[in-house]
UniProtKB/Swiss-Prot annotation:
GO cellular component, one term: small ribosomal subunit
GO biological process, one term: ribosomal small subunit assembly
Function statement: Protein S19 forms a complex with S13 that binds strongly to the 16S ribosomal RNA.
Keywords noted in UniProt: Ribonucleoprotein, Ribosomal protein, RNA-binding, rRNA-binding
Pfam families with a match to the protein in the record: Ribosomal_S19
Organism: Trichormus variabilis (strain ATCC 29413 / PCC 7937)
PROSITE patterns in the record: RIBOSOMAL_S19
Assigned protein family: Belongs to the universal ribosomal protein uS19 family.
Stated name of the protein: Small ribosomal subunit protein uS19
NCBIfam families found in the cross-reference section: rpsS_bact
Top-level lineage group: Bacteria
Gene: rpsS
């Protein structure tokens, strides 16, 4: 179930203020954030945001197709290394 339109999208205040400052200066630099729950807004397009995945910051370049999604969707937290290999040689 989505968020109420009356409330508007969630975005962390510190992240929004950093992006607005960079937009005023017309600068592009990587912004580190731990706020995976923040919604991507149109004013973020063109910026690179380093989203924390629990271990490191994953750089995510924001494009127009990402607007409306959450930052955490683009920084996977789990690494799948495959299932264990079966040892068929030791059977005989």
């Amino acid at each position: 179930m989505g968020r109420s339109l009356k409330k508007g999208p969630f975005i962390a205040d510190h992240l929004l203020s950093k992006i607005e400052k960079l937009n005023d200066k017309n600068e592009k630099q990587v912004i580190k954030t731990w706020s995976r729950a923040s919604t991507i807004l149109p004013l973020m397009v063109g910026h690179t945001i380093a989203v924390h995945n629990g271990r490191q910051h994953v750089p995510v370049f924001i494009s127009e197709q990402m607007v409306g999604h959450k930052l955490g969707e683009f920084a996977p937290t789990r690494t799948y290394r495959g299932h264990g290999k079966s040892d068929k040689k030791a059977g005989r």
